[in-house]
Structures are given as C-alpha cells and as structure tokens.
Amino acid sequence: MQEQQYQLNSAVAEQREVSGVLRNTYGLLALTLAFSGLVAYVSQQMRLPYPNVFVVLIGFYGLFFLTVKLRNSAWGLVSTFALTGFMGYTLGPILNMYLGLPNGGSVITSAFAMTALVFFGLSAYVLTTRKDMSFLSGFITAGFFVLLGAVLVSLFFQISGLQLAISAGFVLFSSAMILYQTSAIIHGGERNYIMATISLYVSIYNLFISLLQIFGIAGGDD
C-alpha cells in the first residue's frame, strides 16, 4: 500500500514538473519570439546590412554556448534574449531582400502563416497524443550531417535545384526537431526550460527561413 502511494506521489510530482517546464518554455518562447520580431522590425526599418557569414556563425555559436553554460542561472535568460535578439537582427536584412521582390509581401506572409501552422500543429499533436518521439534522434543526427554536406557542396558548386532541396530538407529537419524537443519535455528528457526554449526557437527560425526560400523560389517561377 505504501509503495503504491509512493508511486502515485512520484507520478503526481513528475506531472507537476512537466507542466512547469512546459509552461516556462512556452512563456519564454513567446517572449523571445516577440523580442526577436521587434529587433527584426527595427533592423528591417533601418535597412541594416546582413552581417558577414563569419560574424553570423561566431555570434550564433558564441551566444549559444554561452547560454548552455549559463542555463541554470538567471544570466541564462539574459544570454537567451541576446541570442534571439541577434537572430532577429539577421532576419531584418533577409526580410528586406524579399520585400524587394514583386511578390515579396505575399511570400513573407505565406512563410509566416505556414511556420505558425506547422509549429502549432506538431506541438498539439505531441501534447495530445503524448507519443515518445525519441526514435527521431537517429534521423535528426543523420539529417544534420546530410544537410551540412549539402550546404558545403552548394558553396562550391552551382547545382540546379540544390537550394530548393536543401530548404525542403531543413523544413523536415526543423519539424522533426519540434516533435523531438516537445516529446523530450513531456517524457523527462528535458528539464531545463531555457534549453528547451532555445531548441524550439532555432527550429522555428530555420523553418521560417526555409519556407521563405521555398515560397520565394516558387514565386519566382510564376
């Protein structure tokens, strides 16, 4: 009887912890997306240039690893907003590039709507079914290296359709990451809401950029 009561108490405590992580993650994610969007708007309105690729890589990975190091302290929140603000800054020049196209406004609107639909749809699916998506870890690892190789190839060779294939690959990769990370929170694989937020934010960012490229290419063929 005592063992059953202990198991019940443990299950209740675990469920409370999961609910807390989910609540904190989605709350912080909403704030970082809003902050990132504000920075992107300012960057776009000021017509700031897109930074050098090395600046982007150093800025992103530097702030990312800083966030990992500070994830268990209040400073982790500061570095989280620094990272997402930096990514918002890089988004501004990209939006200006698409706004310069004849159908740029509709491309951005379509990419934004599809990103929201995919994120909310996948999140709702995992939260409702509570399926364990840990089996996606192998696909995610393999997908990362395949996409990395494809990106490197695209830097040196002009292959017809490769950019579209890379963008489609990133859509699948980002979708898998959303499923995996949401499932990890539910099933105990992730208990740090800062890391969960960063993972979901990066997935949403990559998903949006990839959909922008796909809709932009499709619109250019019209």
Curated annotation (Swiss-Prot):
Q: Is Ribonucleoprotein included in the keywords of this UniProt record?
A: no
Here the disulfide bonds are none
Keyword Transmembrane present in the record's keywords: the answer is yes
Q: Which GO terms describe its cellular component?
A: plasma membrane
User: Some GO term, biological process aspect, for this entry: which one?
Assistant: negative regulation of apoptotic process
Annotated keywords: Cell membrane, Membrane, Transmembrane, Transmembrane helix
Identify its membrane topology class: Multi-pass membrane protein
A GO term for molecular function: calcium channel activity
Q: What is its main location?
A: membrane
Can you tell which superkingdom this protein's organism belongs to? Bacteria
Places the protein is found: Cell membrane
Q: Which residues cross the membrane?
A: 26-46, 48-68, 75-95, 107-127, 139-159, 166-186, 198-218
InterPro entries referenced in this protein's UniProt entry, alphabetically = Bax_inhbtr1_CS (IPR006213), Bax_inhibitor_1-related (IPR006214)
Pfam families cross-referenced by the UniProt entry = Bax1-I
Family per record: Belongs to the BI1 family.
Designated name of the protein: Uncharacterized protein PA2604
Taxonomic lineage per UniProt? Bacteria, Pseudomonadati, Pseudomonadota, Gammaproteobacteria, Pseudomonadales
